[in-house]
C-alpha cells in the first residue's frame, strides 16, 4: 500500500456531519496509515444553510456541537484544522463582497426563520413547536 506507515494529510472542502471524514480516515487506517491529519479549506460549518444546502438544524452539524478535539476523536484523525473565517474573507471579499458566510458565522443575508429550519423559506411553510 502507498500509505502504509506514512503520515497522511487529507485536504477536504468541508466537514458537515463528519460521517464522510470518518469513513475516509478509517479507510486510510485500514490501509496502514501511521497518522491521518485533516485540513479543511473552509471555516467550521456551525450554522444551518437555508439557501439550498441540506442542513436544516445546528444539531446536524458536527462543528456546532463538538470541539475540534471531539471531532478528531469521532472521526479518528490525529489532527484537524480549518481555514479561519478571516482567511476565507481575505481570499474572497475583494472580488465578492456579498459572499454569504452564514453557515460559518450566523450572519444571514436575510432574516433568520423562527424556528431555525430550512423549510421556513418555502412558500407554504407553517412553523410547528413542540411544547413538551
Residue ranges and their predicted role:
Residues 1-132:
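PRPP-associated nucleotide enzymes
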Amino acid at each position: 500500500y502507498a500509505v502504509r506507515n506514512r503520515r497522511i494529510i487529507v485536504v477536504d472542502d468541508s466537514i458537515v456531519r463528519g460521517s464522510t471524514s470518518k469513513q475516509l480516515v478509517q479507510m486510510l487506517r485500514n490501509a496502514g496509515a501511521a497518522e491521518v491529519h485533516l485540513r479543511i479549506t473552509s471555516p467550521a460549518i456551525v450554522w444551518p444553510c437555508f439557501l439550498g444546502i441540506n442542513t436544516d438544524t445546528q444539531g446536524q452539524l458536527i462543528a456546532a456541537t463538538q470541539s475540534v478535539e471531539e471531532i478528531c476523536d469521532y472521526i479518528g484523525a490525529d489532527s484537524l484544522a480549518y481555514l479561519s473565517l478571516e482567511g476565507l474573507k481575505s481570499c474572497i471579499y475583494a472580488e465578492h463582497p456579498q459572499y454569504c458566510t452564514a453557515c460559518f458565522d450566523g450572519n444571514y443575508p436575510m432574516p433568520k426563520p423562527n424556528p431555525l429550519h430550512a423549510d421556513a423559506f418555502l412558500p407554504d411553510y407553517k412553523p410547528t413547536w413542540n411544547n413538551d
